[in-house]
């Protein structure tokens, strides 16, 4: 966990939670500091990837202002072709950004972690592909439609209790509602 304190000194609002034990599920209230953390990582990625990264965006639940989320920052990186990222695997590794097998079809997946505490997921996707479009559309749709965000939040919270020790099943349990919300977003 990354813990940062603010000027108020209040213990309750001074801990920024980033990171979660691999394989587990715990949702926490949205924290404004997630955006700043994402921007810092995006800045590093821009420096490391240069023009290969056509766009880099904070996505996933930590980028949706009104909902609970696993305290793992998701970042999507758009490239012309997935293969464009391959020459950067070693450079990224030197910055504690590790290639991870078993990603979603159509993307290359990296993680940032400290031991078994995972802090960031970095999704490399084609700029004109469905993956990029889905990440951006989903985030923007839920940020623009608070009632849909709350519906998704309620579903996630129930699923997190049910699958607290099985992140794969938790993720699989959300696919139907995510598909429904993406259909609405793309209408």
Regions found by a protein language model. Give the residues of each.
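Short, flexible turn/loop "capping" segments at secondary-structure junctions
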Residues: 17-21, 66-70, 114
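Conserved catalytic core of two-metal-ion nucleotidyltransferases
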Residues: 97-130
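Catalytic cores of NTP-dependent nucleotidyl/adenyl transfer enzymes across multiple folds
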Residues: 124, 130-187
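Active-site nucleotide-donor binding segment shared across nucleotidyl transfer reactions
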Residues: 44-86
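Helical scaffold of the NTase/Pol beta-like nucleotidyltransferase catalytic core
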Residues: 4, 9-57, 179
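Short amphipathic alpha-helices in soluble, non-transmembrane regions
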Residues: 87-95
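Short aromatic/hydrophobic-glycine micro-motifs
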Residues: 94-98, 187
């Amino acid at each position: 966990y990354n813990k940062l304190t603010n000027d108020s000194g209040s213990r309750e609002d001074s801990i920024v939670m980033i990171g979660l034990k691999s394989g587990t599920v715990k949702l926490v209230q949205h924290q404004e500091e997630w955006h700043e953390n994402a921007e810092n990582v995006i800045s590093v990625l821009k420096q490391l990837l240069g023009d290969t990264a056509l766009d880099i965006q904070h996505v996933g639940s930590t980028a949706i202002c009104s909902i609970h989320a696993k305290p793992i920052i998701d970042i999507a990186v758009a490239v012309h072709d997935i293969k464009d990222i391959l020459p950067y695997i070693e450079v990224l590794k030197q910055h504690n950004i590790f290639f991870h097998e078993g990603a979603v079809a159509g993307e290359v997946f990296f993680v940032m972690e400290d031991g078994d505490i995972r802090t960031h997921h970095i999704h490399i996707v084609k700029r004109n592909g469905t993956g990029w479009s889905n990440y951006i559309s989903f985030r923007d749709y839920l940020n623009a439609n608070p009632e849909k965000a709350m519906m998704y939040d309620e579903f996630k919270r129930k699923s997190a209790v049910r699958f607290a020790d099985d992140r794969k099943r938790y993720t699989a349990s959300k696919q139907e509602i995510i598909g429904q919300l993406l259909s609405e977003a793309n209408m």
